[in-house]
C-alpha cells in the first residue's frame, strides 16, 4: 500500500476544516491499523464508510474489502477523495448526508456488509440510532466516537453512564471496546478523548418483547426523569395507578427503584406486563 499521509493530503489541496461539520481527521497510523484489524474485514465484505475525509482510512479498507462505499456530506471533499481514490475500481463515493440516506439502496443484494467509520461527534447518536432502528443488514459497526458516548454505549446497570442509548445499542448488538484515542491523534485536535468500539449485530434482539415501540417508550420514560422512582417516571405512559401497580407486581420489580438499576431483561418484563 502506498504511503498515504493525512497532513500531506490536507496541505496538498489547501483544505480548510469545517467546525460546523465537526471535522477531525485521524493521523495516527497505529490507530488506523487498529480500526481495520478490529473490523475483521474479509475479501468478500462490502464496507460502508461514513465521513471518509481525505481517505486515510478508506484506502486501508479498499486494500482488504471487495467494495467500499463512502458517504461524504462536505462538498469540498468530493473532488479530493475522488482524485485520491481514482486508482481503485472497487470504490464508490456518495455525496449526501448519512442521516438522509436509505442504506438499503446502497446495500442492495450484498450479503456481508460492515460499517467502518470515524463518526463526527455532533451526529454520532442520531446515526447509530438510525443504523440500528431501521433494521439495515449490517454484520458489524466498527466506529470511532466521542469517548463520552462510547462509555454510555458500553455501560452497565447502576452506573452514571447507563441510559437509553445503552439499552438501544445492547438490544441489537454485542459491544466491544477496542481502544481510547487521544486528541493528539487528530488534526485539528478535538478537546476530548475518542473511543473505538465494535458493535456486532445479534441474530435476534437480546430480549424478546411483545411490543418493541412500547419497550423503548418505557425505557425513555425511565431515563427522561432519571432521578425519580420508576413509579413516578411511568406516569407519563398514561396508565391507571391500578394497572401500573399490577404491571410492577407481575414483573417482580419494585416500583421504588430507579430506571438506571434495571437490566435490559427487567425492562423487557416490565414493558410486556404493561402491554397486557
Curated annotation (Swiss-Prot):
InterPro entries: KsgA/Erm, rRNA_Ade_diMease-like_C, rRNA_Ade_Mease_Trfase_CS, rRNA_Ade_methylase_Trfase_N, rRNA_adenine_dimethylase, SAM-dependent_MTases_sf. It catalyses: adenosine(1518)/adenosine(1519) in 16S rRNA + 4 S-adenosyl-L-methionine = N(6)-dimethyladenosine(1518)/N(6)-dimethyladenosine(1519) in 16S rRNA + 4 S-adenosyl-L-homocysteine + 4 H(+). GO terms for molecular function: 16S rRNA (adenine(1518)-N(6)/adenine(1519)-N(6))-dimethyltransferase activity; RNA binding. Its EC number is 2.1.1.182. Its main location: cytoplasm. Keywords: Cytoplasm, Methyltransferase, RNA-binding, rRNA processing, S-adenosyl-L-methionine, Transferase. It is an enzyme of class 2 (transferase). GO terms for cellular component: cytosol. S-adenosyl-L-methionine binds at residues 24, 26, 51, 72, 97, 118. It holds the Pfam family RrnaAD. It comes from the Bacteria. It is found in: Cytoplasm. PANTHER family: DIMETHYLADENOSINE TRANSFERASE, DIMETHYLADENOSINE TRANSFERASE-RELATED. Specifically dimethylates two adjacent adenosines (A1518 and A1519) in the loop of a conserved hairpin near the 3'-end of 16S rRNA in the 30S particle. May play a critical role in biogenesis of 30S subunits. Belongs to the class I-like SAM-binding methyltransferase superfamily. rRNA adenine N(6)-methyltransferase family. RsmA subfamily. This is Ribosomal RNA small subunit methyltransferase A. The lineage of its organism: Bacteria, Bacillati, Bacillota, Clostridia, Eubacteriales. The gene is rsmA.
Amino acid at each position: 500500500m502506498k504511503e498515504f499521509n493525512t497532513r500531506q493530503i490536507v496541505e496538498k489541496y489547501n483544505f480548510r476544516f469545517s467546525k460546523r461539520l465537526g471535522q477531525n481527521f485521524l493521523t495516527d497510523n497505529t490507530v488506523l491499523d487498529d480500526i481495520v484489524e478490529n473490523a475483521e474485514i474479509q475479501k468478500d465484505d462490502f464496507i460502508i464508510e461514513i465521513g471518509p475525509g481525505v481517505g486515510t482510512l478508506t484506502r486501508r479498507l479498499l486494500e482488504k474489502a471487495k467494495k467500499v462505499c463512502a458517504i461524504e456530506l462536505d462538498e469540498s471533499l468530493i473532488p479530493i477523495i475522488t482524485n485520491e481514490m481514482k486508482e481503485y475500481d472497487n470504490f464508490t463515493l456518495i455525496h449526501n448526508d448519512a442521516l438522509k440516506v436509505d442504506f438499503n439502496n446502497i446495500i442492495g443484494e450484498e450479503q456481508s456488509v460492515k460499517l467502518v467509520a470515524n463518526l463526527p461527534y455532533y451526529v454520532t447518536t442520531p446515526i447509530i440510532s438510525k443504523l440500528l432502528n431501521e433494521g439495515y443488514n449490517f454484520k458489524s459497526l466498527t466506529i470511532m466516537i466521542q469517548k463520552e458516548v462510547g462509555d454510555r454505549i458500553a455501560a452497565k446497570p447502576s452506573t452514571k453512564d447507563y441510559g437509553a442509548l445503552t439499552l438501544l445499542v445492547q438490544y441489537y448488538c454485542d459491544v466491544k471496546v477496542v481502544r481510547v484515542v487521544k486528541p493528539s491523534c487528530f488534526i485539528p485536535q478535538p478537546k476530548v478523548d475518542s473511543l473505538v468500539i465494535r458493535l456486532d449485530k445479534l441474530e435476534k434482539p437480546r430480549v424478546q418483547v411483545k411490543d418493541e415501540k412500547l419497550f423503548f417508550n418505557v425505557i425513555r420514560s425511565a431515563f427522561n426523569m432519571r432521578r425519580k422512582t420508576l413509579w413516578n417516571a411511568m406516569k407519563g405512559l398514561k396508565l391507571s395507578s391500578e394497572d401500573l401497580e399490577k404491571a410492577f407486581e407481575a414483573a417482580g420489580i419494585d416500583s421504588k427503584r430507579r430506571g438506571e438499576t434495571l437490566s435490559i431483561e427487567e425492562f423487557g418484563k416490565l414493558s410486556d406486563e404493561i402491554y397486557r
